[in-house]
Each structure stands twice: as C-alpha cells, then as structure tokens.
Amino acid sequence: MINKTKRLMVPRTVKIPRKTYFWGPTPLPGRHKADHSVTLLTIIRDYLRLSDKEREATRILANGLVKVDGKVVKERKFGVGFMDVIEISGESYRVVYNNQGALVLVSESKDRANMKPLQVKNKVIAPGNKIQLGFHDGRVMVTEDRSISVGDVVIASLPDMKITEIIKMQPGNKAFITGGSHVGETGTISKIEIKESSSANLVHFDEGFTTVKDHVFVIGSPRFTFTMPSGEVYP
C-alpha cells in the first residue's frame, strides 16, 4: 500500500510547493475526503512553518500541542478539512476554501473557535424513533429534532458537539460557496431550483450568480449568522 504521494500529484486543494521535495504526505482515511483534506504535517511544516523537517513536526504533535476541534491529535497524517478548527500553542485557525479552491488556514477569534458549523449531508431514522444526521466532515449525530433537513447547517459547540443553532437552506439566508467557479465567495440565496431530472439542483443568488446546490454551505439567517474568519491567511 502506498502511503505517500508525489508532490506533483497532490490535489490542488492542498497549497504546497510542488518542487521543494519529491514526496508529499497522504492523509489517512478519516472524516474528510482525501482530495479535500490536508495533513497536520503539511499544516505545521508548509502552512504555518513551525518546523523545517517532518521529524520536528512529528515532535510537536507527539507533545500534544495540537488540537483539532478541541481534541488533541498526535497523528501527523491526520487529515483536516473545511470548517475544522486547529489550535496550536494557544492560537486558533479555521480551515476554509480560498477563491482558487485551495484549503487555507485563517486566524480565528477565541469566541468563535469553540463553534463548528456542520452541514447535513444525509438523514435517516435511527432506533428509538430518533433521527441520525450525517455531516459534511463524516461525523454522525443522533437527535430528536425532526426539523433539521439535508442541506441545513447546524452550529455545534466544541468539543462536546452539542447543537446550539440551526441555519436552514432557504431563500434569504447567506451562504459560502465551496466549489465551482465562485468558490470562496459569499452571497444571499434568492431561489432554490429543484430539478425533476438527474440534473443537479441549482441555487440562485442575489449577487447574480448561480451554482449547484452541493457547493452551497449556508452560514447565516435573520436569527443567527456565523461570521467567516477574516484574520491572517496561511500559507
């Protein structure tokens, strides 16, 4: 089994120099898809530049200095993805897409570093007549709240993962675009177009653009808005 990838073949979502080294780390199977995740080794060495060598980055992790979503992680090939919160030496960062579609780190404020937006990707009935929700980062949660639908975003507290807010996928709400030609942009939903064929459902925005529904991540409603981080960007 190959556990590393040539740097020239690393997905473009990972923003690293392509010719500095021959090999690039491959994320272990985890919550995020491999082509939409970045290893902690890459985060420490190439994004934040807290180390020059893999051995130094591994030592930082082994000392328990890195948290992901409020929990210590020591595996250097652990993959982090969209909306994950990384804490290193008291500084917090959130993983987001830039307008080229690459995953980058943005400095996050202390009051928002304990919040995790999670988009519902699937919803099934669980034993006990409860609802099981599957989220964009691979997490699964059981709840009794039947009002949550696929496409909605819940705001969970970290690290206990308790739902504090629900943002519906509906016209009038704000959204962040996670793919396509408008990746990294935000806009206000004007209309959701449901296709009766096998074509992808479309979402239209007040700003004049349209994208497929799978690329829309709602972040705000009249009741509550999750403010995207606007601090320093790495790398």
Curated annotation (Swiss-Prot):
Alphabetical list of CDD domains matching this protein: KOW_RPS4, S4
Q: Which Gene3D superfamilies match?
A: 2.30.30.30, 2.40.50.740, RNA-binding S4 domain
Domain of life of the source: Archaea
Domain called S4 RNA-binding: residue spans:
38-99
Which is one GO molecular function term here?
Answer: rRNA binding
User: What UniProt keywords apply to this chain's record, in alphabetical order?
Assistant: Ribonucleoprotein, Ribosomal protein, RNA-binding, rRNA-binding
Disulfides per UniProt = none
Q: Which SUPFAM superfamilies match?
A: Alpha-L RNA-binding motif (SSF55174)
Q: Which InterPro entries match?
A: Rib_uL2_dom2 (IPR014722), Ribosomal_eS4 (IPR000876), Ribosomal_eS4_central_region (IPR013845), Ribosomal_eS4_central_sf (IPR038237), Ribosomal_eS4_KOW (IPR041982), S4_RNA-bd (IPR002942), S4_RNA-bd_sf (IPR036986)
GO CC terms on record?
Answer: cytosolic small ribosomal subunit
| Biological processes annotated in GO | translation
Q: Pfam families attached here?
A: Ribosomal_S4e (PF00900), S4 (PF01479)
NCBIfam families in the cross-refs = PRK04313.1
The family assignment reads: Belongs to the eukaryotic ribosomal protein eS4 family.
Mind telling me what this protein is named?
A: Small ribosomal subunit protein eS4
User: Which gene name belongs to this protein?
Assistant: rps4e
